[in-house]
């Protein structure tokens, strides 16, 4: 990285990875900002992240968001479409906030991962809920899932494109505003867990 002859690789040739800060200490190992081996211009590294147990923690966070957009049968496997959505969403985020969109995405993921959840403990036919802490990797997974689900539901039967909805969702989640689907869900999950401690 320090070698001046090397070209600095930016995401979509616009957004720099270098000035991205992580506000949450516990998630530092689980939110990869730059791909581990070498930086890429697009959020597509074609890595086999499901081979080992925690391998997917090394997957760049923007790529995990991209992969999570390819949900609901009709979008399966359409990564080009997902990459295009992410690209548009990042441009919209930059226009609205004047921040590095990668930073906004990281903040959104940190803010929308629930910290505790209620699990079902059943013994002899009596099922009760018990509050449990959530591991850092599961927090990241939940956050990504909630963010993309919120964007997808907002864009469905709506004039706004999914890129605009995703941008709104990420900006609101990064601010911690309750207009965001992910933040609302996170609060709900934590509220249920608190009631079942």
From Swiss-Prot:
GO terms for cellular component: small ribosomal subunit. SUPFAM superfamilies: Ribosomal protein S7. Keywords: Ribonucleoprotein, Ribosomal protein. One of its GO terms (molecular function) is structural constituent of ribosome. The keyword Ribonucleoprotein applies. InterPro entries: Ribosomal_uS7, Ribosomal_uS7_CS, Ribosomal_uS7_dom, Ribosomal_uS7_dom_sf, Ribosomal_uS7_euk/arc. Belongs to the universal ribosomal protein uS7 family. PANTHER family: RIBOSOMAL PROTEIN S7. This is Small ribosomal subunit protein uS7.
């Amino acid at each position: 990285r320090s070698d001046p002859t090397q070209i600095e690789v930016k995401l979509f040739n616009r957004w720099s990875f270098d000035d991205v800060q992580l506000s949450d200490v516990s998630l530092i190992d689980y939110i990869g900002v730059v791909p581990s081996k070498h930086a890429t211009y697009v959020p597509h590294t074609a890595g086999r992240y499901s081979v080992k147990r925690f391998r997917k923690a090394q997957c760049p966070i923007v790529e995990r968001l991209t992969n999570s957009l390819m949900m609901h049968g009709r979008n399966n496997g359409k990564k080009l479409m997902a990459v295009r959505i992410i690209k548009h969403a990042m441009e919209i985020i930059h226009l609205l906030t004047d921040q590095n969109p990668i930073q906004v995405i990281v903040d959104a993921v940190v803010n929308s991962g629930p910290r505790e959840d209620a699990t079902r403990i059943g013994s002899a036919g009596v099922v009760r809920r018990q509050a449990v802490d959530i591991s850092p990797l599961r927090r990241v997974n939940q956050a990504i899932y909630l963010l993309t689900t919120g964007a997808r539901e907002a864009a469905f039967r709506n004039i706004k494109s999914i890129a605009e909805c995703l941008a709104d969702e990420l900006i609101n989640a990064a601010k911690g505003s309750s207009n965001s689907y992910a933040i609302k869900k996170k609060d709900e999950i934590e509220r249920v867990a608190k009631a079942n401690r």
